[in-house]
Design a protein with these regions (language model features):
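Short, basic alpha-helical nucleic acid-contact segments in DNA-binding proteins
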Residues: 148-156
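Basic, short loop/linker segments at the boundary and entry of helix-turn-helix/winged-helix-like folds
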Residues: 12-19, 60-119, 141-143, 151
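Amphipathic alpha-helical interaction elements
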Residues: 30, 120, 137-138
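Active-site phosphate-binding and catalytic loops of NTP-dependent enzymes
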Residues: 44-59, 155-156
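DNA-recognition alpha helix
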Residues: 126-138
Length: 156
């Protein structure tokens, strides 16, 4: 019996030992690694592991998770970003913000560098998405996002 796996985004099965299967597993490992880093960061801030009862040592509480699509160098990856409320000194609560995956971050630094490299090579903002289609693999990229990225480059 031949080993098969389902291709992400479709019901078509592909052989488990092909280049597509390798990329699929790598994307899965990237997703797991990003989620583990975010969980570690949140546990450090809260002072407790998920579902742990530690009493006064806890600095806040979890309250669900939301999906976020992050475009990595292997294509788009959907991660579950945990949410938490942090207790302040005066008893006020604030929403936790991850330092690992920033609030409006949609691409990794390597993807941003690739976008800037294509732009600096002379490609106009509308054609960059087509030029980087193999890298982005359907990940979102608008001409406005490219313009904002170039604007940040000009400021630096």
């Amino acid at each position: 019996m031949e080993h098969c796996t389902k291709k992400p985004g479709g019901d078509k099965e592909i052989p488990a030992y092909t280049a597509d299967a390798i990329e699929t597993r790598m994307r899965e490992r990237i997703r797991e690694t990003i989620q583990a880093l975010v969980e570690e960061e949140l546990e450090a801030v809260l002072g407790a592991e998920k579902s742990a009862r530690v009493g006064e040592a806890r600095q806040g509480y979890r309250h669900g998770a939301r999906e976020r699509t992050l475009t990595t160098s292997l294509g788009p990856t959907t991660i579950a970003m945990p949410r938490a409320r942090l207790r302040g000194a005066a008893g006020a609560t604030t929403e936790w913000r991850s330092e690992t995956v920033r609030r409006y971050q949609r691409r990794t630094t390597r993807v941003d560098e690739a976008i800037l490299g294509v732009y600096l090579a002379g490609t106009n903002t509308r054609r960059i998405k087509g030029a980087l289609a193999p890298l982005l693999r359907g990940g979102p990229l608008s001409k406005d996002a490219v313009s904002r990225l170039v604007g940040r480059l000009r400021i630096q």
